């Protein structure tokens, strides 16, 4: 079910003259669009939201939607419909977003505001138990002793979906680069489910829809297990996935062997995209049919990367998708 060659950029959206931002195909795939806010839009947005520190967004959740409206208004109210259309479009479902003039760790608060505004034009970001907020910021360094692969720099973090060990609906994932020092490697890895060469054989396997147990390590601050299958379907009957190799707990030999084979088949796909994400940029993907991971870094004693993530549910046209709940 490799559909990559059949994918064409949405010429209507790409050819349209947009207010406040530029839209273009990414260098990696026509499925991934690159959206850049102009310098003037960036300047006006930051000026209008300067009265609210990030703490205000944490304490008053409605402000997250207010700053989203400010950004959409600056874009002639063209931004929100385009974001929703792109993320719900099975042929795309992914954006690499940046803003001219936001590219330095000293602007970390501004980065959080921008990402929050974008996310709350499509839905709402869920509570993140790891941080205790609607977003999480975390650092990758040269040495790591944590209990998951999230911060381990010298190995590939395998392809996965987010939201596998929580009960909240996780339709989208946003991943932003806040800082990077002494870095080489570590590109984001993406795989669209329809481009995976082995989708048909795994999706039609008897274990594909079997309910399995998912459990997170202590650092995730989630105390109970959840139960769901690896695969499901959307309302059009197309495969969607909810999978991460670290947290699935096979109950027997049959499940363990199948999950191991599934992991190997994902990691050896020839259609994995390697996407550099510079400081200030962020990826926004549909979590149901995109998997994401991270390539390894080259060791350096002063290696440092800071990331910010948000993940949540679509508030528009959500009935188009099953959510495994």
UniProtKB/Swiss-Prot annotation:
Q: Which Enzyme Commission number(s) are on file for it? A: 1.14.11.64
| Any single Pfam family the record assigns to this protein | CsiD
Top-level enzyme category = oxidoreductase
Q: Does the keyword Zinc apply?
A: no
What species was this sequence derived from?
Salmonella typhi
Details of cofactor binding: Binds 1 Fe(2+) ion per subunit.
Cofactor(s) needed: Fe(2+)
- Tell me which domain of life the UniProt entry assigns to the organism this sequence originates from: Bacteria
Give the protein family: Belongs to the glutarate hydroxylase family.
Query: Which residue spans adopt a coiled-coil conformation according to this UniProt entry?
Result: none
> Can you state which reaction this protein catalyses?
glutarate + 2-oxoglutarate + O2 = (S)-2-hydroxyglutarate + succinate + CO2
Q: Where is Fe cation bound in this sequence?
A: 160, 162, 292
Which gene is this protein's source?
Answer: glaH
**Entry protein name:** Glutarate 2-hydroxylase
Q: How does it assemble?
A: Homotetramer.
Q: Which GO terms describe its molecular function?
A: ferrous iron binding; glutarate dioxygenase activity; oxidoreductase activity, acting on paired donors, with incorporation or reduction of molecular oxygen, with 2-oxoglutarate as one donor, and the other dehydrogenated
UniProt function note: Acts as an alpha-ketoglutarate-dependent dioxygenase catalyzing hydroxylation of glutarate (GA) to L-2-hydroxyglutarate (L2HG). Functions in a L-lysine degradation pathway that proceeds via cadaverine, glutarate and L-2-hydroxyglutarate.
The UniProt entry, under NCBIfam families, shows:
PRK02963.1 (NF002814)
Q: Name one GO biological process term.
A: L-lysine catabolic process
